[in-house]
From Swiss-Prot:
Subunit-level organization: Associates through its SH2 domain with ligand-activated receptors for stem cell factor (KIT) and erythropoietin (EPOR). Also forms a stable complex with the Bcr-Abl oncoprotein. GRAP is associated with the Ras guanine nucleotide exchange factor SOS1, primarily through its N-terminal SH3 domain. Interacts with phosphorylated LAT upon TCR activation. Interacts with SHB.
Name under which the protein is recorded: GRB2-related adapter protein
Keyword Membrane in record: yes
The protein's role, per its UniProt record: Couples signals from receptor and cytoplasmic tyrosine kinases to the Ras signaling pathway. Plays a role in the inner ear and in hearing.
Organism: Homo sapiens (Human)
Gene: GRAP
Implicated disorder: Deafness, autosomal recessive, 114: A form of non-syndromic deafness characterized by congenital profound sensorineural hearing loss. Sensorineural deafness results from damage to the neural receptors of the inner ear, the nerve pathways to the brain, or the area of the brain that receives sound information.
Length: 217
């Protein structure tokens, strides 16, 4: 996960991470605190205020969802190579890549060197974004030709990709998306008649369809 600093930030506590406007930071954990993310810059980790940064769009990032839910989501996408990246349930800051293999879903643990680089096999990457881009054109599997492919859009009608919250919603588990009445949510997927998947304020998760109204922007 990459983000760009909108403003400079000076750390005032030992666990905070200082950065300058324009810096690109790696987000390690955005699930545990509403206002602070854990991030890394030039090999140093610490907490940063989320309102000082802009998270780059990551439709493939699904947050801390379970392995089972990842499989359910990907098996509903009927194309080989459909994928998502999720945060480990047991080890915050660690990630897995889940990939549709056609008849099943395979999971790859993303490993990290001491220097902070990410890898699955031999190639090393500075960020998850670089890893994803590499495996779009290089097979992620060893015994089959499988390339990462973005989810095919399910929302075809103009203006139907956004919804406005009609009520407050508080997530009951890490896979869900909290929001306040009036918030605008980007709808990423409609895997279920009652639950949609969307993004708001840099977070991605599931929310009840009955709490929102599609809007034209």
């Amino acid at each position: 996960m990459e983000s760009v600093a909108l403003y400079s930030f000076q750390a005032t506590e030992s666990d905070e991470l200082a950065f300058n406007k324009g810096d690109t930071l790696k987000i390690l954990n955005m699930e545990d605190d509403q206002n602070w993310y854990k991030a890394e810059l030039r090999g140093v980790e610490g907490f940063i205020p989320k309102n000082y940064i802009r998270v780059k769009p990551h439709p493939w990032y699904s947050g801390r969802i379970s392995r089972q839910l990842a499989e359910e989501i990907l098996m509903k996408r009927n194309h080989l190579g459909a994928f998502l990246i999720r945060e480990s349930e047991s080890s915050p800051g660690e990630f897995s890549v889940s990939v549709n293999y056609g008849d099943q879903v395979q999971h790859f643990k993303v490993l990290r060197e001491a220097s902070g680089k990410y890898f699955l096999w031999e190639e090393k990457f500075n960020s998850l974004n670089e890893l994803v881009d590499f495996y779009r054109t290089t097979t992620i599997a060893k015994k089959r030709q499988i390339f990462l492919r973005d989810e095919e859009p399910l929302l075809k009608s103009p203006g139907a990709c956004f919804a406005q919250a009609q009520f407050d919603f508080s997530a009951q588990d890490p896979s869900q998306l909290s929001f306040r009445r009036g918030d605008i949510i980007e709808v990423l997927e409609r895997p279920d008649p009652h639950w949609w998947r969307g993004r708001s304020c840099g977070r991605v998760g599931f929310f009840p369809r009955s709490y929102v109204q599609p809007v034209h922007l």
